[in-house]
Amino acid sequence: GNGGNGGNVPSGAADGGAGGDARLIGNGGDGGSVGAAPTGIGNGGNGGNGGWLYGDGGSGGSTLQGFSDGGTGGNAGMFGDGGNGGFSFFDGNGGDGGTGGTLIGNGGDGGNSVQTDGFLRGHGGDGGNAVGLIGNGGAGGAGSAGTGVFAPGGGSGGNGGNGALLVGNGGAGGSGGPTQIPSVAVPVTGAGGTGGNGGTAGLIGNGGNGGAAGVSGDGTPGTGGNGGYAQLIGDGGDGGPGDSGGPGGSGGTGGTLAGQNGSPGG
């Protein structure tokens, strides 16, 4: 059977409930989400773990509260995928993705950090690792968009998760957050967030691509994320592009037996 979902918080300063764990076969429950306008601190609940033999991890809960983080995705069992991390809407970090199955399975994707009101630059959650023999790493979440003057600049993207031990690609790094939103007439100063780094591949597989730097509203240079490297057979990930003349990320190294190096970011 599956684990139960964590309770949601419709409003107020409280954390969402954690999702329940499955036992032998079944998926973990999703973490509870926190809603309403930001009136306090309330983190998204963590996802439950999948069953020991087979089952996906539950997704982390999301939050609309300020200074609060999205929940972490649950870990998979022997076979299954890790849960995705929850997003954070104001001044908080996206939740990390859960790990893939201990034999076969993909890591969960990291949650996004949507925007900052100017106090904290939230970063995207890191993608979960594939910890078994076969599976891909999860993608990193996007960094927060800068909308305030107290902490100028966008948030950094999350790093991609690593591929499985034998066969698997590294996850892509998340993109950095911008400092100019189309609906905002006056650009916010500062560089866009740094792109996340791509994950490392398994023995066979490609490294993840680095995330792009966020777009700056005033032309401040921003940096792209580095591409992940391959190990034995596979191509290195491409570096993420920089912004406003900032450096792109370096390309990852190709496999020692066969593979090409990733291209540097422009």
Q: Could you describe each region identified by the protein language model?
A:
Residues 1-266:
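Glycine-centric low-complexity repeats
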